[in-house]
């Protein structure tokens, strides 16, 4: 078995995702691995009148700029490993798996919010979907309180 040299870390900028990134950074340091830090912007798929398209595009462009800056900030605070920021739009469940294939990820690291019961059934679990469909092992990190 070869140890992973390419890690994909999915972030939604939550505390749980930041803990997953810290775990991945520690792991990457020990394995001399590279990290691809991915954020997925969910874009609603609904019919929008032509007038609203410009507003929606402006909002998406603004969100992309903000999320790029946040990814760069997360990476710059962890200079001990090579982190490449990746920003995509779409359904996170699909995009995470697609990007894992694109970058040749050998391990996906992501946080889990630990939703239970009805909320989990209604919302679904991104982590659970990724575990089922990923082309490589997936390490999920539960948020812990200090």
Predicted ranges, named:
Residues 1-3, 23, 30, 75-108, ...:
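Structural beta-alpha unit
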Residues 2-54, 146:
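Small/aliphatic-rich secondary-structure junction motif
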Residues 25, 72, 128:
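Active-site phosphate/pyrophosphate- and oxyanion-stabilizing loops and adjacent acidic/basic residues
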Residues 36-38, 84-88, 139:
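General small-molecule cofactor/ligand-binding pocket signal
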Residues 44-45, 95, 117:
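Generic structural signal for helix capping and beta-alpha/helix-loop junctions
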Residues 55-69:
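A short acidic, glycine-rich active-site loop
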Residues 66, 87-91, 113:
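Short beta->alpha linker loops
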Residues 99-146:
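Gly/Ser-rich helix-loop-strand patches that form or flank binding pockets
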């Amino acid at each position: 078995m070869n140890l992973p040299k390419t890690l994909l870390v999915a972030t939604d900028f939550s505390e749980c995702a930041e803990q997953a990134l810290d775990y991945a950074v520690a792991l990457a340091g020990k394995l001399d691995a590279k990290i691809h830090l991915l954020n997925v912007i969910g874009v609603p798929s609904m019919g929008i009148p032509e007038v609203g398209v410009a507003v929606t595009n402006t909002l998406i462009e603004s969100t992309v700029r903000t999320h790029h800056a946040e990814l760069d900030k997360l990476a710059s605070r962890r200079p001990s490993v090579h982190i490449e920021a990746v920003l995509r739009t779409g359904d996170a469940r699909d995009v995470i798996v697609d990007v894992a294939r694109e970058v040749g990820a050998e391990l996906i690291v992501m946080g889990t919010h630990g939703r239970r019961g009805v909320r989990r059934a209604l919302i679904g679990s991104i982590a659970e979907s990724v575990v089922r469909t990923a082309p490589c092992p997936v390490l999920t990190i539960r948020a812990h309180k200090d």
